[in-house]
UniProtKB/Swiss-Prot annotation:
<dbReference type="GO" id="GO:0000428">
    <property type="term" value="C:DNA-directed RNA polymerase complex"/>
</dbReference>
<keyword id="KW-0808">Transferase</keyword>
<feature type="binding site">
    <location>
        <position position="462"/>
    </location>
    <ligand>
        <name>Mg(2+)</name>
    </ligand>
</feature>
<feature type="binding site">
    <location>
        <position position="85"/>
    </location>
    <ligand>
        <name>Zn(2+) 1</name>
    </ligand>
</feature>
<keyword id="KW-0862">Zinc</keyword>
<dbReference type="Pfam" id="PF04998">
    <property type="entry name" value="RNA_pol_Rpb1_5"/>
</dbReference>
<feature type="binding site">
    <location>
        <position position="460"/>
    </location>
    <ligand>
        <name>Mg(2+)</name>
    </ligand>
</feature>
<feature type="binding site">
    <location>
        <position position="895"/>
    </location>
    <ligand>
        <name>Zn(2+) 2</name>
    </ligand>
</feature>
<dbReference type="InterPro" id="IPR045867">
    <property type="entry name" value="DNA-dir_RpoC_beta_prime"/>
</dbReference>
<feature type="binding site">
    <location>
        <position position="898"/>
    </location>
    <ligand>
        <name>Zn(2+) 2</name>
    </ligand>
</feature>
<dbReference type="InterPro" id="IPR006592">
    <property type="entry name" value="RNA_pol_N"/>
</dbReference>
<comment type="function">
    <text>DNA-dependent RNA polymerase catalyzes the transcription of DNA into RNA using the four ribonucleoside triphosphates as substrates.</text>
</comment>
<dbReference type="Pfam" id="PF04983">
    <property type="entry name" value="RNA_pol_Rpb1_3"/>
</dbReference>
<dbReference type="InterPro" id="IPR042102">
    <property type="entry name" value="RNA_pol_Rpb1_3_sf"/>
</dbReference>
<dbReference type="GO" id="GO:0000287">
    <property type="term" value="F:magnesium ion binding"/>
</dbReference>
<feature type="binding site">
    <location>
        <position position="888"/>
    </location>
    <ligand>
        <name>Zn(2+) 2</name>
    </ligand>
</feature>
<dbReference type="InterPro" id="IPR007066">
    <property type="entry name" value="RNA_pol_Rpb1_3"/>
</dbReference>
Amino acid sequence: MKDLLNLLKNQGQVEEFDAIRIGLASPEMIRSWSFGEVKKPETINYRTFKPERDGLFCAKIFGPVKDYECLCGKYKRLKHRGVICEKCGVEVALGKVAAERMGHIELACGLAHIWFLKSLPSRIGLLMDMTLRDIERVLYFESYVVIDPGMTTLEKGQLLNDEQYFEALEEFGDDFDAAMGAEAVRELLHAIDLEHEIGPLREEIPQTNSETKIKKLSKRLKLMEAFQGIGNLPEWMVLTVLPVVPAPLGPLVPLDGGRFATSDLNDLYRRVINRNNRLKRQLDLSAPDIIVRNEKPMLQEAVEPLLDNGACGVAIIGSNKRPLKSLADMIKGKQGLFRQNLLGKRVDYSGRSVISVGPTLRLHQCGLPKKMALELFKPFIFGKLEMRGLATTIKAAKKMVERELPEVWDVLAEVIREHPVLLNRAPTLHRLGIQAFEPVLIEGKAIQLHPLVCARYNADFDGDQMAVDVPLTLEAQLENGALMMSTNNILSPANGEPIIVPSQDVVLGLYYMTREAINAKGEGRVFADLQEVDRVFRAGEAALHAKIKVRINETVKERDGSVVKNTRIVDTTVGRALLFQVVPGGLPYDVVNQPMKKKAISKLINQCYRVVGLKETVIFADQLMYTGFAYSTISGVSIGVNDFVIPDEKARIIGNATDEVKEIESQYASGLVTQGEKYNKVIDLWSKANDEVSKAMMANLSKEKVIDREGKEVEQESFNSMYMMADSGAGGSAAQIRQLAGMRGLMAKPDGSIIETPITANFREGLSVLQYFISTHGARKGLADTALKTANSGYLTRRLVDVAQDLVVTEIDCGTDQGLVMTPHIEGGDVVEPLGERVLGRVIARDVFKPGTEDVIVPAGTLVDEQWVEFIELNSIDEVIVRSPINCETRYGICAKCYGRDLARGHQVNIGEAVGVIAAQSIGEPGTQLTMRTFHIGGAASRTSAADSVQVKNGGMGASRNLKQVERADGNLVAVSRSGELAIADEFGRECEYKLPYGAVISVKEGEKVEAGAIVAKWDPHTHPIVTELKGTVTFVGMEENITIKRQTDELTGLTNIEVLDVKDRPAARRHTLRPAIKMVDAAGKDLYLPGTDVPAQYFLPANALVGVADGAQIGVGDVIARIPQETSKTRDITGGLPRVADLFEARRPKEASILAEVSGTIAFGKETKGKRRLVITPTDGSEPYEELIPKWRHLNVFEGEQVNRGEVISDGPSDPDDILRLLGVSALGKYIDNEIQDVYRLQGVKINDKHIETILRQMLRKVRISESGDSSFIKGDQMEYPGAGRERASASEDKFISKFTRVLLGITKASLSTESFISAASFQETTRVLTEAAVTGKRDYLRGLKENVVVGRLIPAGTGLAYHTERMARRDADKPLRVSASEVEAALTEALNSSGN
């Protein structure tokens, strides 16, 4: 018995380890794992069903079939444990040892491992410096390779075909050694002297100029250094021994009819063994060379599919016409080992059922059907029954439970008391998709769910199912109760707003009870307190909507935390007074003294949470729900067809529109307008008509006439059921009502273009057949889009989680003072997101001063909460530098100060919070709501007129930013720089900025006062002017009629215009010699120079420019000498929605990206080539001029002689994030990506906190590229981790030349694959490539992320698991002297491997 206990003890032991290393296995190592050689291809005997000896399932090698019983049955039972039977050679042991025992096959000749041969770049090829094609010719016995040239003229590694080989034999005899096949490759690999090769390579790299060569050399150098560093021997890439996986991994299942379902691996192994045995026999018989040469490549071709089927061209197909599943396929993909078995497993103790509403539950409860509870908690019930002495054995307990005796139900009730269960609804898109509840036993078979948690599960009751899981261990129950309980998750982790907001019926009920009605029963009465109102209402003496006065006592919490009580009389309604009874103390009466629409209720709950705390809020939310349900029941709101009131004006509006359309049609018929103009006009018309109808309809619905107390007829807000539903936010919207009672309007075709004929009917009137048919387009497209969208969104989430999974808060403060500059987010002069919202929950990086003084009002290191936000807005501060995850300098993970507030909890983030995964979920979860379409700008969808002036929103002082301007003779200023802004500062010094284009005429001087609404700048939106900065005389250069220019005379006005011809329209002979330009000269005809430079004032004219001055004309400063027409109406597709978000996170370079200035300096144009212009920037600091060739069709925003700053736009287009990072730095990149992604989400009305996007961005920026290697061991172009590079820099000694590096932006997929952890990368994508690389370079995985730890089956180093890991490390450090360090072990291992290899 003692033995047995020891045995069980030994089984449960966990080996403690800190890292996993992957490497190449030497033949000796493979033999040491093996328990015997597999010699026969047979699996089991078809008659006896016993494994064949020496076969693939051989019991002698892999262990017994039954526990503790040998094959022939001589030894049975536990007492013979460890005995090896002399008859059948099987060891008596547990049957499951077969899962870990391996066999091997001794190969008759060496074979190249397909991963190291074919997985690009071919590792074998790199080491031998041969191409893959050449190596294959050797392997497949097409060519000889020279292994040792001896004293001959041949070279090592040279290929010889048969003829050449025999010639060489005749010429040199035995002086040289050449061979073919994998053996030859192995010899060559064995002969490589790494020490000898590395030195010359290191010296050669700095001397090479060609980029491609450097790349190739550094790849080779890296590979050699890796081999040298870890004791992998190159020749191990050629296999001489093949391991055989244990039998249970290739199981046999008997089917009817005496056949077996077998794993594909067995087929693949069988082919290898057959061919290997045949080859062995041939070698033993010393068969002719030609036969052997035929057999060896066949063996190579048998081993390749076993390791990776399909990697070498055509996959081998099994009997079921499908490719066989090889060893590599076992671990790849969604069905592979990593994703199927290691990262996610199916769990026991779980059930699922349909959900139904539980309106009587409390927020922390769920209704669990008794049947399910009985099944789920069975072991607990058995235990309790035995403990109580109601059952003597487990078997008896089982009987009791099956008979469902009354005692069992009592025990069950006791077992589930305070034992939370997890409820989960698929798809679990964010962490709120799994939550803990306390079960309440109910009859019936459906799980009951609290209505307020539906929002986070995205659940409805139309047949959704949910799963229940039981946390078993005490620790798990504690975590469920403390962390995952639904009552502890009131705020959304994505944006910090409450997520238990009532919806639908509840909102309707609350809205109904807080509306007011004119002349309701009891209007004008005055009440002493809320209780009196309640009594009178119940007695039926006052109506719910009656306007009354009531005296209230309210307690209000002040900002400093003190409580003030006051008593006042308020004008209110009966319903609002009743509602105030459930509001917790500490909130003022004003929060309910309004019609409670959905937004107001959300605000109320948020305020409640901030003022009175979690517990009160939960109770309040429940009370709100009960009240809402009660009053929506009483209200009797329903929908009848008469609620859809069709406005009387509809017929007139549609009639007018139809007439106008006819008019346009006749114009088109007589050729006055083009097809395109007609289409646009018609669509504009119908859009307008549609708006008018819906306005009329809403006006009609929203008001009703009633008689007041004086008997006069007055208007009040309508009590129309449908209007109330839409207005309260309970359901429906103006757009939906428009389709029911207005007109359906214009429909789009599946390709996004709009159909000219609108649907003038609505659903109440009914649609005609044609109208119905037109509308089916849209409906179908919607469904198809949704299906595609879900898959894409899920994949985006998966990539995000993968890139951010190892980001955990690991320390309080990293000590950096870097941060992002936060300003209000402004679009077109409107504040979309005020500064307060953006800095809420962030830590201030540098002191904030009071505007215009040196007083610090917010010190650095402050965590900004709601009170600080008020304070910042009061002091009208317009920018704050806050800490950001992008700038955090923590080596592994991130620090709490850079992250700031934990959005779901409302306080500074705890150490151990997995902020990376939370960020990924917050961005990915709303992904399904984003659209998939790319929008066509054009048509009626969004045609906005081009802006042509700046109108000031708020008055103030004018000031210009980054603006070059010249003063015209009439006193107006003209902007002559690209990225200038006009800033209007209000009395607090807060600035509102307006962008000004080149050539804008500005009517406000520096420091001048401006009134609100004044127009301060104007420009022509359709042309791009060229403005002179000088006074002088115009001379034309290179302008010859009909060669470079053509004159056009306008017939109506009689004015002549000069238009510059496009290059391709000019005569071929003089196409490139003449460059039309306008030159400025003074009265004497001498060249004038641009102000402040020695560049002659010469303006080169691009194609299609219109010149508005005559040769020899006198012009003044700021005059327009030429205009370039802008094509405003060009429709460019802008990618919207999900694809846009994915593009940004993948850091893809957009097509025709904008061109930015690489250096600050003066613009000039050099010699043109055929299709390109040469742009030259002469830097202001006097360094080498920078040249760039730009295609001629690109429209340039700069002119000769203009000053530009580094990073300014030279040619418009979508921005390339790489350029922004390189030229403007990390902060600018952060701002750009933040704003772009937020724009997409904002359009859908989704709120996501900026810091989630920054968190992902930090992971995309985690690598740096070495630009100068200095004295370090790096090579130019290497990539390494950013925090590590900083440390490397800091730790370099004084005299060492430190390596220089630049930050690199990687897309999320690239970043995931280049993590330090190979386990995480391999379980993500491209498993083969990742593992090959890791094995060759002998990578170590230090198991720092979450994924790696899940794979090896440990607690994750986040949350409660972080404490466990910290404690484990501490314990280990305490035991240090007793243990050997990992590096010592590795050294010993390497030595052992080397000696075994040699």
